[in-house]
Amino acid sequence: MFFHKKRDVHGLLLLDKPQGISSNNALQKVKMLFSAKKAGYIGTLDPLATGMLPICFGECSKFSHYLMESNKKYHVIAKLGEKTSTSDSDGIIIKKRPILINSFKIKSALKELTGLIEQIPPMYSAIKHNGVPLYKYARQGLNIKRSIRKVLIHDISSIHQEKNLIEFKIFCSKGTYVRTLVEDLGEKLGCGAHVIFLRRLEMASYLHSQLVTISYLHKLLRKEKNNNFNFFEKIDNLLMPIDSPVSFLPKVYLFPQQSYNFQLGQTVIFFSDIKNSLVRVIALENNKFIGLGRINTEELLIPYRLVSRSIN
């Protein structure tokens, strides 16, 4: 199975990343199972974290940055009274304090962390300094000055606290570091805190129910060995369309000659009520997505980002 020739695979897989492996490790496992030539993930999850890790195959990667800009939802459990070197349970405990809190103090602290807030990215992160990820400096005991970032915490809900644990769900903008938010919460409560459980539930408009596990892919592989069915055909059916990351954009349809010219990178005349907007361009002859275009005020459709003609 793993000696198959690499394939041209195109589409989006919503992977349910398991705990204990890096996002890149999860990507490589899935890429190998699909025997895919090209694939990349969107939105790094720490080894501790589980949940939604979108993987873009082939031409889908051209549109992946739209997902990078999207909001995300997480389920978080934090342990109070202990601050760690990594702000999660993978690190070592560097400070312990008594937990002297009540429900009012918790709600007040979380309210302060809702809305537009400032965060300093943690040293244990993939952000690069002089081309080197910060976590590599951190492992050497170095502390690099990081710029303050503004992030938007839309909502913190389903709050539950019992003994030294606090649980909640957070809906936030791109670039939010949940570990940093939990550490800041611990400081506001005066006892310290770190993440012991983190799961990404949603990203953009994708739902938790759409996730696919690595174990399920292996189950299909074992089934192929025991039964006569096409493994690749089965797993390719799990992929979402190439234009899935831009599904929020309106569609426009082109006739064959228009479609041909558009795919050559030529501007085409197009009458529409849509003005000054990006649109998904669909070829009428086969109903396939051929790229993104922008309709200007002069009723012209200008190519913006094209799907390779070789797959249409």
Curated annotation (Swiss-Prot):
Its EC number is 5.4.99.25. GO terms for molecular function: RNA binding; tRNA pseudouridine(55) synthase activity. Keywords: Isomerase, tRNA processing. It comes from the Bacteria. One of its GO terms (biological process) is mRNA pseudouridine synthesis. It holds the Pfam family TruB-C_2. The active site is at D46. It catalyses: uridine(55) in tRNA = pseudouridine(55) in tRNA. It is an enzyme of class 5 (isomerase). Substrate binds at Y74, Y177, L198. Responsible for synthesis of pseudouridine from uracil-55 in the psi GC loop of transfer RNAs. Belongs to the pseudouridine synthase TruB family. Type 1 subfamily. NCBIfam families: TruB. This is tRNA pseudouridine synthase B. It comes from Buchnera aphidicola subsp. Acyrthosiphon pisum (strain APS) (Acyrthosiphon pisum symbiotic bacterium). The gene is truB.
